[in-house]
Structure formats: structure tokens, C-alpha cells
Amino acid sequence: MDVQERLDAILDITDSKICPHCLGRRFSDVMEGPGNRLRGERLVEKFSLHLEGPCLVCGDVFERLDEAALRVREKVDDLNLEYSSVLVGTRLPDDVLRIDEEIDRRLGIQVEGIKREVNRELGKRVTSILRCPADFESPDLVITVDLRGQIRVHVQINPIFIEGRYRKLVRGIPQTKWPCRSCRGRGCSRCDYTGKMYPTSVEELISEPVLEATGGSDSKFHGSGREDVDVRMLGTGRPFVLEIKEPAIRTPDLRALEDEINRRARGMVEVADLRFSSRNRKVELKESSRKKYKVYRAIVELEGAVSDEDLVKLEKLDLIRQRTPLRVSHRRADRIRERRVLEISWKRLDDHLELIIKAEGGLYIKELISGDSGRTEPSVSSILGVPARCASLDVLEVGEPA
């Protein structure tokens, strides 16, 4: 149908109770123009139309957008947030969405839906009144305005991400907060009512000063792999990303934070190279952990004498078939993994042996040494022909993909 026929059909369906926005939107596919409202006003002028209200399609929702934008500013101001970008969305009455779709169906046309226009028009007002741009990919704030009855505003504060590297300089600290096995975090006599298996963790030592500086509600720690509780993380440290949820401050002074974390950690943990990051980096860090090589220093106890000729045989360690270790089988899938030892060197230390092992990520080093009752093959123990045990272990380097 031509413009006149479409116009007549619209006026008949709505009994002329339609606003310029909802009228102009139905001609966006056949008429150029700077916007639906102006397009509708041109149609009114050109065809001498007399439109009545309230609009049968939208219920005059467009007349409420200025008020809605003011309500958004009030809400955001009350929250006292730091932000530099927003994304605005709305909730409309179901009958408005249904009528809008039904009219287009009866006309046999495919044009922009009412919700998209309302979002755009309100978004323009909000970004203007807040003096910040819209960001459709990674906004600081996601603002949802409920226009179903009384105007209600909900503000979602998106997280910030800070990455860096940490060194764990003492043993006996887990990477992340470890809930008590008995009470599962509720607090009991076993955990001295702390809800934790250990007094602190790398995660807590790093996150607590950051939460204070940002006013965040919670945090989540993402490491590039993890070391055991009794293992130190030395060298240049392990990469991590700290996710801070609902921060009031999005750009804290990272140099000052670095100093504060290190001061409060009292030599247990150190951080370096703090910088702002992104959600994608969190995913990359997790996915790359398996591909990174690790360098370890292991002090090994041997239950028997071995010659230097025996020790040279350790250089043959290459492809390792490792079944899920017994010590983690209660929380890891029972399967066989293949990992490679990339380099190994040895040095005698009195009645112990020092091994420097470079290996692919995901290889369990303690079990590489002991053999784990035959679940890891080959192993240091099987090659030397004597029982071997890892007395202490340090991670010296978390490198780039091997």
C-alpha cells in the first residue's frame, strides 16, 4: 500500500488516537526524516490530520520521558557514584508492546518497535542530563526505567577489573578464601567461629584494601592457576584479575593501593604492576593458565641412595600421564591428563635433592615426584627406583604459553 493507504489504515485502526511518535514510526521504512516524531508531525501537516489523545498505542509514554530522565538523575546523584558511561533501557506495559506489534502485523509492515524508540529517546535525555556518553558494550552503569505505572529507576553498577601479579612469600596461605569444611562458612568451634579453614588468604589480603578504596560491595579473585596452601609463589609472581562488584569509585589510585596492600600484608604477600583491566581479560587469564609454563623448585626426600648416574636419568622425563591425584580426587574429575616436563635439573643438598622443573601448566609436581601410588607415570620415584617425596615446593615462574 502507498503512504495514503497506510495512513488511512492506521487512522482507522487507532480511531485517530495516535501520537506523532507512533505515527511516524510506521513510515520509517518509506519516508526519510530526522526522527519518528518529526516524521509524524510532517504527516499531520501534509494531510491536515487531527490526532486525538491519549495515544492508543503507547499511552502517551513519550510525554513521560523528560520526567523519567529527571528521576534518573536524582537516583544517580543519591548513589554518589563515579561513572563515565551509561546504558539506558526501559520496561513498558505488556499491552503497549502487544498493541504495537498487532498494528504492524495488521498493516503487514516491519518497522522499528516502540521499545527501541523509547530506549533511544530516553537514552538521549539521560546522557544529556548526566553529561556522559552511552556505551553499548561495557557501560559503567546500566539504568533501567520502569514505565509501567509509577516511574521507578534501577541502577546496576557494573564491576571494575584490576589485574596485576602477586607473590606469596610464606607457606600456609590459600589463594582464595577457604570456607570451613565443618560449618561451610557459618562459623563453628572448629574454625573458631570465623567460618574459614585458614585465617587469611591471598584473595583477602589483596581485596580488602581495594574494597575499602572503591566502596565495592564484594570481590572475586581470578588467578592464572593456583599454588597449594603449602607452596610459595616467588619470582615475578602469578598473574591475577580482581573483580570489584558495585564500586562507588571506579578509578582508585593504583600506585597507592599497591603500597597499601603490601604494607598491610606484612611480608606474607606482595603485589606489583596493578592496572585496570576488563571482563575479557578475566576469561583470557583462566583459558591461558593451561598453556603457560611453570618453573618450580622442589626439595625432595629420597628413601634410599641414588647415584649421579641415576639422577641423569631424570632428564628423560618428558610426556607424563597423570591420573587425578588422590589428594584432590574428591573435588576434581577422575581422568587421565597428559602434560610435559620441558626441562629438569638437579643438585644434591646434603641428604635431600633440589630439582628445578620447567613444565606445562596443569602438571601436579608433588605427584610427579612421588608417583602417587602409580597414578602418575613416569615419575621421579619410578625413574630413580626409590620412594621419593616432595618436602617443600616453590613456584619460581609463571611464564607465557609454552
UniProtKB/Swiss-Prot annotation:
It holds the Pfam family Pus10_C. Residues 37-159 form the THUMP domain. Substrate binds at residues 296, 364. SUPFAM superfamilies: Pseudouridine synthase. Keywords: Isomerase, RNA-binding, tRNA processing. Its EC number is 5.4.99.25. The active site is at residue 228. Gene3D superfamilies: 3.30.70.2510, 3.30.70.3190. GO terms for biological process: tRNA pseudouridine synthesis. One of its GO terms (molecular function) is tRNA pseudouridine(55) synthase activity. It catalyses: uridine(54) in tRNA = pseudouridine(54) in tRNA; uridine(55) in tRNA = pseudouridine(55) in tRNA. InterPro entries: PsdUridine_synth_cat_dom_sf, Pus10, Pus10-like, Pus10-like_C, Pus10_THUMP_arc, THUMP_dom. It is an enzyme of class 5 (isomerase). Belongs to the pseudouridine synthase Pus10 family. Responsible for synthesis of pseudouridine from uracil-54 and uracil-55 in the psi GC loop of transfer RNAs. HAMAP family: Pus10_arch. This is tRNA pseudouridine synthase Pus10. It comes from Methanothermobacter marburgensis (strain ATCC BAA-927 / DSM 2133 / JCM 14651 / NBRC 100331 / OCM 82 / Marburg) (Methanobacterium thermoautotrophicum). The lineage of its organism: Archaea, Methanobacteriati, Methanobacteriota, Methanomada group, Methanobacteria.
